């Protein structure tokens, strides 16, 4: 029987275009340092991570350009919607990510922003390489063909 305090993982924001625009090599789960009004605003489900990315500054990884709108009930202690947010990772993970970005020309992009079973805000971060236009077209052709194949199989019975 499940614990009373255990909650399911609840995805609050997802970057759907990331899998189309990037070839994803590896994913990693990172904590994210937030203020109280940011957590409440994310729980309202209005945040977006579609045009955001992660970057390294002074040996730390920061989430840049993620939009978490102001919490409506928050008064003068509200947060700035597009401020850089620190990602919480182990030193070994940070070194691995910085190495991939610096040496191999990879990009760090967020895939999902969610609350885990313990109610903590987490970010699924991907180490990815940008796709060229012809790669995107190829991905689209494969997707269309698999859709068409499914239709044909359903039609045949």
Swiss-Prot record:
Keywords: Cytoplasm, RNA-binding. It comes from the Bacteria. One of its GO terms (molecular function) is RNA binding. Residues 133-157 are annotated as: Disordered. GO terms for biological process: trans-translation. Residues 135-151 have a biased composition (Basic and acidic residues). It is found in: Cytoplasm. Pfam families: SmpB. CDD domains: SmpB (cd09294). One of its GO terms (cellular component) is cytosol. Required for rescue of stalled ribosomes mediated by trans-translation. Binds to transfer-messenger RNA (tmRNA), required for stable association of tmRNA with ribosomes. tmRNA and SmpB together mimic tRNA shape, replacing the anticodon stem-loop with SmpB. tmRNA is encoded by the ssrA gene; the 2 termini fold to resemble tRNA(Ala) and it encodes a 'tag peptide', a short internal open reading frame. During trans-translation Ala-aminoacylated tmRNA acts like a tRNA, entering the A-site of stalled ribosomes, displacing the stalled mRNA. NCBIfam families: PRK05422.1, smpB. Belongs to the SmpB family. This is SsrA-binding protein.
